[in-house]
Amino acid sequence: MNSGIRVLRDRAAPVALAAVLALAPTAGARGQEAPQLNLYGVSGLIDMPSALSQPDGRVSATASHFSGITRGTLTFQITPRLEGSFRYAGLADLNYSGYRDYYDRSFDLAFRLLDEGRVLPAVKLGLQDFAGTGLFSGEYLVATKTLTPSLRVTAGLGWGRLGSYGDIGAPFGARPAANVGRGGKPSPGQWFRGPAAPFGGVEWLVNDRLTLTAEYSSDAYDLETGGSGASAILDRKSPLNFGASYRLGKRATIGGYYMYGSAVGVSLSLVADPYDPPVAGSTGPAPLPVLERPARSGGGAYDTGWTARAGVAESYTAQLAGLLKDHGLAMESLTLTGTTAELRLRNRRYDATAQAIGRAARAMTQILPASVETFRIVPSIDGLAASAVTLRRSDLEALEHAPDGAARLLERAQIGDAGRVPAAAMLAPDGFPSFTWQLGPYVSTSYFDPDSPLRARLGLELSARYEPRPGLVFAGALRKKLAGNLDSSRRFNTSALPPVRSNAALYAREGDPDVENLYAAYYFRPGDNLYGRVTAGYLERMFGGVSAEVLWKPVDSRLAFGAEVNMVRQRAYGDLFGFRDYDVLNGHVSAYYEFGNGFLGQVDVGRYLAGDVGATFTLDREFRNGWKLGAFATFTDASAAAFGEGSFDKGIRLEVPLSWFTGTPSRTSAATTIRPVSRDGGARLKVPGRLYESVRGYHRQVLEDQWGRVWR
């Protein structure tokens, strides 16, 4: 729920992601009950999977190594039953497919079909490496049963790689030959076909930290033992593996293993749980109390004669603006009548919009005269009035300390469209023009280059933002490299498409310092339920031009539609303000839908930066505390051959609010996107301040989800 939240995508996101996994404890009971992660980084035994699942929403990172085989895996428990993983593996000295050291990327999906009961085991169906090169491709059906509190057994049947040793035949027919091509495409015709082989194992939970495991593996490791012309890097003498894993407190697990009768293996797993932040509760300044008015029989406190006295309304405006500022809120305007007040404000501190609404309402009770009964609070982002929350002052007074006060206040609140600024609105003193600047570190990363799993650059970024009036923004950022190897990549454009993203290394090599962006933006409301944006300038590191967008999003609706058109030219590699000779007209029409339970869907159809036409499908899961994880895939008229390695654009993304780390309210979050490979097909323009995410957090669905924090 990051509307208007400052998202640090490539500036500090990689550091924050590492911190999420390294610093975040998991809940004691949840952590002890969670199954161990295997060497593939998924819930399992040692090298084989199990039917158990991680706690809902958990993010896990696992690094493992044995016999020249190194794997790094990010695993997401997408729902209580669905687990997804992205893996990057390196096989040293394999001498395969023209590479001495061979690197491979893969995706896994696993779905728990059956929960464990008193008699029946848990049952899971899984696809391993279902959309990669197929090097680790396999499928499985596995069951796990807890026999005693300290003893679990697992048995399963594997196909593909997991059916390559000790098979019992091919119950569903022969497995078609793999047609990997450029990789990156699922091959459903192969799934659960070919030889099937049993696997299994036993886990002994010695105590709440130590687990001993023994397993029988159905993976023959044909390639790693010298098959298909590769060098033998593993001597597979036995199908048996033995291991011990040990929990280091609540956030990490280490493991040691004896693999296949010949090799020693090690692993390290780090986990983070969105339901259990490092800091329990919420820190920061306490909210103001609701100031109760005197009884109506107590004199003239409710008289509205103050409205006729010169300067009184202006005095209330100045006092309220100062009090709001002390609590991280910025007034844009205040409109007063004898009985109503409309406050337009910017939320500069609270990641939960409902908390900002509650703090503003409390401040209004402190300042405004007793005759003002109706508070209409209009949150604004970039000058866009996003919604209007109307509260009765008497409800605030009556429900502040009620056990179910938040729920009852929500029942009585009205949430609707903001409408236009009233003609009698008084602008906040010192509100505009507004100028802010910041100097700080940034980290840019490149993940999973086939020649190197991680490249990074550390530097300083100077950013500034000037707003002469609501809705008009001038902003920019300048970067200077301090250290890193982001410019060492030698992989450049090899596809048939224009190099709109694949030449990123040239920008890193020749652009130092570089203007990350420099633009002007105008935000406006063309009508009820409508939002508009026009942005012009150097929009991102690789492109500059003009972008225009309109969004239809009623406050009460789960559904939204948007349209965006961009006319852009590619920026020069090393010239701060120059351009290259490639320009493109691109844009999309978009549909957004909030399914409920935190799931958000988005479909974008249109023309991409390389001129290809198609659609992007995105599904995110958002937690009430602001965590968001999701996946996307783009399909265009660019063929797999034209796209190059990976066949089509796809990836996963994770966003974590800073407040989750600190317990202190903050509008900043860290986000990172992981693609198996970055190519030119399906590439979209990166425009600051797109409308949907800017306004959605102030609409009914998000406000209701967060309303429990209205009194905090």
Predicted regions and their residues:
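Flexible, glycine-rich linker and terminal segments associated
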Residues: 33, 182-186, 190, 194-196, ...
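Outer-membrane beta-barrel translocator/channel fold
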Residues: 89-108, 112, 124-142, 146, ...
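Residue-level detector of the transmembrane beta-barrel scaffold of outer-membrane proteins
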Residues: 60-62, 73, 83-85, 122-126, ...
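Short loop/turn motifs that connect adjacent beta-strands in outer-membrane beta-barrel proteins
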Residues: 30, 51-56, 114-123, 134, ...
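Bacterial N-terminal signal peptides that target proteins for export
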Residues: 2-16
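Membrane-embedded beta-strand positions in outer-membrane beta-barrel channels/transporters
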Residues: 47, 60, 71, 106-108, ...
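Bacterial N-terminal signal peptides
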Residues: 14-24
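Transmembrane beta-barrel domains of Gram-negative outer membranes and organellar outer membranes
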Residues: 29-135, 147-151, 159-161, 175, ...
